[in-house]
């Protein structure tokens, strides 16, 4: 399965391109990629970039897919799925837990569903820590054409989704969902 790192955001709350911000001597996005590469189920890592940051992302030596739509995570996932089934994460998720990702991919492969998404008991989804079939791209395309850009709503509208109940999983795996939004968040990973 492809590991797709979404790297097309604008980093408004961070104040600068957070994915290029160096933490312990390397850019944030590389911390995320290294964790993803630690997954036995991931055969190839790609970066989904915006047209504006394509060149910066190409510097890391990974295949870069450009999200020309840049309408949010929905178009990033849409772009990633052009290459096949993918496990999608945000580029600002440096605490990914490879065992958890492998678990989700195994559930996805065994389920035969169009997507496998972690879900909290209150219904909140973790769509940027999920496995998607390339066939989910058709659903995304239809929603994008209608101007419906919320990835969570696209997932909820699909009838063939595997949901993983987060509360039933090891407590430590929840750290995998952590993402950096503001500079204050960096203390969690700089220790």
Swiss-Prot record:
Highest taxon listed in the record's lineage: Archaea
Protein name: Probable molybdenum cofactor guanylyltransferase
Chief place of localization: cytoplasm
GO cellular component terms, semicolon-separated: cytoplasm
Family per similarity comment: Belongs to the MobA family.
Organism: Pyrococcus abyssi (strain GE5 / Orsay)
First-tier enzyme category under EC: transferase
Pfam families named among the record's database cross-references: NTP_transf_3
UniProt: Mg(2+) binding residues: 92
Keyword terms, alphabetized: Cytoplasm, GTP-binding, Magnesium, Metal-binding, Molybdenum cofactor biosynthesis, Nucleotide-binding, Transferase
Job description of the protein: Transfers a GMP moiety from GTP to Mo-molybdopterin (Mo-MPT) cofactor (Moco or molybdenum cofactor) to form Mo-molybdopterin guanine dinucleotide (Mo-MGD) cofactor.
Single GO MF annotation: GTP binding
InterPro entries named in the record: MobA-like_NTP_Trfase, Molybde_CF_guanTrfase, Nucleotide-diphossugar_trans
EC number: 2.7.7.77
């Amino acid at each position: 399965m492809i590991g797709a790192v979404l790297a097309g955001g604008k980093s408004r709350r961070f104040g600068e391109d957070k994915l290029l911000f160096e933490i312990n001597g390397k850019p944030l996005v590389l911390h995320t990629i290294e964790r993803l590469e630690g997954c036995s189920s991931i055969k190839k890592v790609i970066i989904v970039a915006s047209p504006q940051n394509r060149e910066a992302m190409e510097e890391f030596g990974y295949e870069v897919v450009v999200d020309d739509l840049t309408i949010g995570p929905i178009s990033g996932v849409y772009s990633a799925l052009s290459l096949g089934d993918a496990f999608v994460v945000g580029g600002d998720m440096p605490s990914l837990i490879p065992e958890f990702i492998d678990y989700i991919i195994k559930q996805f492969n065994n389920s035969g569903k169009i997507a496998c998404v972690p879900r909290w008991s209150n219904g909140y989804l973790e769509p940027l820590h999920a496995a998607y079939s390339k066939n989910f791209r058709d659903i995304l395309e239809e929603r994008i054409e209608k101007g419906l850009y919320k990835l969570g709503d696209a997932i909820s509208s699909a009838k063939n989704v595997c949901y993983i109940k987060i509360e039933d999983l090891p407590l430590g795996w929840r750290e995998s969902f952590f993402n950096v939004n503001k500079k204050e968040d960096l203390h969690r990973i700089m220790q």
